[in-house]
Amino acid sequence: MLQTQELQVNIGPQHPSTHGVFRMLVTVDGETVVDLKPVFGYLHRNHEQIAEANSYLQNMPYTDRLDYFNSMANNHAYAMAVERLAGIEVPERAEYIRVLMVELTRILNHASAVGFMINDMGAWQTPLAFGMREREKILDLFEMASGARLMCNYFRFGGVVRDLPPEFIPNLRELLIALPAYIDELERLLRDNEILLQRAIGIGILPREVALSYGVTGPVLRGSGIPYDVRKAEPYSVYDRFDFDIPVGKVGDVYDRFLVRIEEMRQSKRIIEQVLEQLPDAKGGHINPKARQNVRPPVGDAYARIESPKGELGFYLVSDGSGKPYRYKVRAPSFINLTPLADMCRGYKVADIVVILGSIDIVMGEVDR
């Protein structure tokens, strides 16, 4: 009988498939994965310690750089934590603008994730560019509102830094008209491509019990069939005023996770349409004029969490009464969602690791901080 020997190979930290500087120490028997050990820390920037040396407002642009795909969502969670700590109220119009920006971010993130997944399977560049097509239109909207495309620094305590410009909503309506056909076409790429189906169906299965035990959230958890979404479980901002569904998968494989993201794009479009219907027409309502930006919250602590595109994003803040946080802690969904990677890869082929990792949808700036 032919004898085989297990080998240990490194994938990363500098590798095009790892979505950042991330190393996987993989034990293989031939082409089969026996074990996998993720190695973090290559992009550690001391984010939390730096935040404790800054004022509360100075930390807002730092949150942009956690998950640079989703700066609006990062801003939202941090602003909510400070507002709870300092007792700051947010005007109704500002709440609607915040939801609008975060749901646009969700569409942007998921379109990119689908493009990256197809890219990871070997369909080089063209599908990725297709996934990025509508993303560019959303970035144009962000630039209209905030002046920046990626790291927007748009939220402030008590609202947003400036109101929507006059040209914003007409351009947004044009995007909403084009989105259904775009999402349908993305879905056809998933459903009708035989190679993609072979690389995704039954690969990287994360059973619901295992998903719960690791504490994963977002599309990774919902892909395993668990309908948990912070927007429904603990409604924040004005999410309780919107009608939307929580898509879930069946078996928790790569295919389910990306079908969940496709459907979430449709649900985000539904929410945005409801935002436009309900958006209060209040001049100056984009921010609470009484809210101080150089806040000195009373002694205490606060935790705020939101449903970011990658999962549950939370900020825990402790105040000692000064203008700087005594303790600043981030609950990063990319980090938590990476923890079951070894369980998701065992028994599959080395070539499947790249696809499984891509289906988790991580950004190393958020993982390592």
Swiss-Prot record:
Catalytic activity entry: a quinone + NADH + 5 H(+)(in) = a quinol + NAD(+) + 4 H(+)(out)
Family matches, as SUPFAM superfamilies: HydB/Nqo4-like
Keyword Nucleus: no
Leader peptide range in chain numbering: none
Pfam families (alphabetical): Complex1_49kDa
Keyword Membrane carried by entry: yes
Family as reported in the entry's similarity comment: Belongs to the complex I 49 kDa subunit family.
The protein's name in its UniProt record: NADH-quinone oxidoreductase subunit D 1
Lineage: Bacteria, Bacillati, Chloroflexota, Chloroflexia, Chloroflexales
